[in-house]
Amino acid sequence: MELYFLGTGAGMPARHRNVTSIVLNLLPERGSIWFFDCGEGTQHQILRSPVKLSKSEKLFVTHLHGDHIFGLPGLLSSRSYQGGDTPFTIYGPKGIKAYVDMSLQLSQVHLDYELAIREIPSEGGVVFEDESFRVEAAPLDHRIECFGYRIVEKDLPGKLQQEKLHELGITAGPLYGRLKQGQTVKLEDGRELRGSDFVGPSIKGRTVTILGDTKPCGNSALLAEGADVLVHEATFGAEREDLAAAYDHSTTEQAARTAAEGGVGALIMTHISSRYQGEGAERLLEEARAIHPDSWLAEDFYSHAVPRRQS
C-alpha cells in the first residue's frame, strides 16, 4: 500500500505544482489503484509517473471545485482508449453525476467499460465495503460540500504455524488451507485439529485518511483518529491563519495539531499555495514538525509507503 501524489498545488496549476490528484496504490492488496480527485493536467502527470491508468478501479471526489475535478472527463475517456474494459466507479458529492454525464454527452465520448457513479449523502457514511476494505466518508467544513475519506484495510489472518504441524507429522496440503481459515479438521487417525491452535495473531490492517479542502472541524478529527497516514491540506503557513479561515482552508500548524491530537502516524501535507517555494516550503515543514515530528510536505510525484504500525 502506497500513496502517490500526482498534484499537490492549490487553486490552479503552477510551474512547480499541478492541482490535486492522489493515487492510493493497492496493486499488492487487490491488483488495482484508486484515485482521489482529478484536477486538470492529471493525465500529463500520469505520463511522467509509474501510475498505470489501466489498473484504476475507483475514483473518490472530495468536492466539485475545478482544481479537483477538471481532469476527470479526459481521464475517463483515455481509460477507454487505452483498452480499459473493467468496471470503474466514481464516488463524490451530489452533482458529480450530472457533471460527468454532461461532459461525456456533449463531447460524444463512448466508454468501453461499465461506469458507475455513486453520489454520497450529505451526512456521509460507509460508501464502499468488501471482504478486504471499508471506505467511510464524512462532510468537512469548506465553502461547498466537501468530504474526507477514511480507508480501512481489514485485519488479515495470522500466519499458519507450520512448524507445529510438522511436529505432528502433518505436511503441506489441502489441510493447511482449511486450518488457516480457522476450521476444525478431523484426521484419518481420529485426531481433531482446531485451526485456531495453529494460526498466529491476526495482522492488523492499515488506515489511511485523505481529507478534502477544509478548515479545522470535528469530522476531520474523527476521520483522522488513529490513522497510519493522514493526508491533510495545508494551503497556508501559520502566519496566514486569518486567510485560511476566510477561505475555509487550513494551515500547517492546524493540520499538525489534528495529527498529533488524533494519534496519527505520518502526516502528509498537500494542497499548498503557490506562494510557498524553496525556503518558504521548508518553513511549512518546520512549522508542522514542531507539533507533529512525523510530518511530510508532499511535492508532485512524491510517494509514501503506508507501514504497518506496531500495536
Model-derived features: positions:
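Conserved beta-strand hairpin/beta-sheet module of binuclear metal-dependent hydrolase folds
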Residues: 1-49, 85-87, 149-151, 158, ...
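Metal-dependent catalytic neighborhoods of phosphoester/phosphodiester hydrolases
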Residues: 72-78, 277-287
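A glycine-rich helix N-cap at a beta->alpha junction
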Residues: 109-120, 294
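Metal-dependent phosphodiesterase/nuclease catalytic metal-binding core
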Residues: 23, 121-269, 280-286, 306-311
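Active-site neighborhood of phospho(di)ester-bond hydrolases with catalytic His/Asp-centered motifs
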Residues: 36-39, 56-64, 93, 209-212, ...
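A short helix->loop->beta-strand "cap" motif at the edges of active sites that frequently abuts
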Residues: 84-88, 262-267, 293
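Active-site metal-binding motif and surrounding structural segment of the metallo-beta-lactamase
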Residues: 40-91, 119-121
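Divalent metal-coordination and catalytic microenvironments
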Residues: 3, 22, 46, 63, ...
